[in-house]
């Protein structure tokens, strides 16, 4: 073995997360008590007992991280974010707390429309500047990879501007970004009463322009009574797939609308939200091997019920991923630790199932085969936590405990922490 670039030692355990979502989550996390982790050239090079390290693996240039008895796991992967936007909507937050609903605010011209106005007015440079602190907060939570959606442009120029900002942002932060086109987030004000014209704009102009520049890996649609119909979503997502963008769907969040069945029909990568999913929808998703992405922070933020039925989803055999859905309107929070806690308290998952969802489950949803686990050859993305067990993360609600965050073998975050209680 060549000399390691980085070695993490003195761990309580290392979670390599080598298992499958079809087995018991506690087993799928594959804990290695007292193991060390070695990284070389941005990849995992060794996981095992320290005594098993080959002679010469640790040299003068090896950075040695003392885990101080904390556990080590893969970097978190956030499969659902809206990191790039301008403006803020704290006034709407206050209105909701006085009884206004999300749909009432949207119909009055607030909601997504207000963020669209601010994002259209911002330059690409300003969008990058505004998003950089959000990436830092995600990194401090232990997130090393995040999906990022557009969707606050709703016109050709601004959707391109947002995705170019995502690309630029990825050169300025250690956080790895996976771009998704969400031009079908809402029908913009100027197309009110002309929704078919907007659907055609998405299909005939926005999608081809994004594909020409290679700006998005995925294409998403918000399928809902207040957004896009199943038929409209089918047309947009099929057009995106023809251009190389894999479908993702905002599905069955506010009403039962057939979005889960559509995700299954299209063989989508994910169906996200699923607060209103039916048993028939779950069966369709399971049969089509679609990942369910839970975003409980938004359910909390909107003061809605029910939460997505995580227990039923998991028991139906679906791979479950867990995201923050950080966005200015329905989940202004980069707190992965809070999402883990809510997944247990409100979605009905065990601590192991929630941890799987934030690591390997999320990586699978993005098609990232070498992320979200720690086996030799995988991405050198890992987190050294200040607590001895992953079970402490959802229990200590909203507290990250990410003491050292490593991205591609380099330390991206180092935070002073003593103990975990």
Swiss-Prot record:
Cofactor section: Zn(2+); Fe(3+)
Metal-binding keyword on record: yes
Localisation: Cytoplasm
Known EC number: 3.5.2.7
Entry keyword set: Cytoplasm, Histidine metabolism, Hydrolase, Iron, Metal-binding, Zinc
Matching InterPro entries: Amidohydro-rel (IPR006680), HutI (IPR005920), Metal-dep_hydrolase_composite (IPR011059), Metal_Hydrolase (IPR032466)
Protein name, per record: Imidazolonepropionase
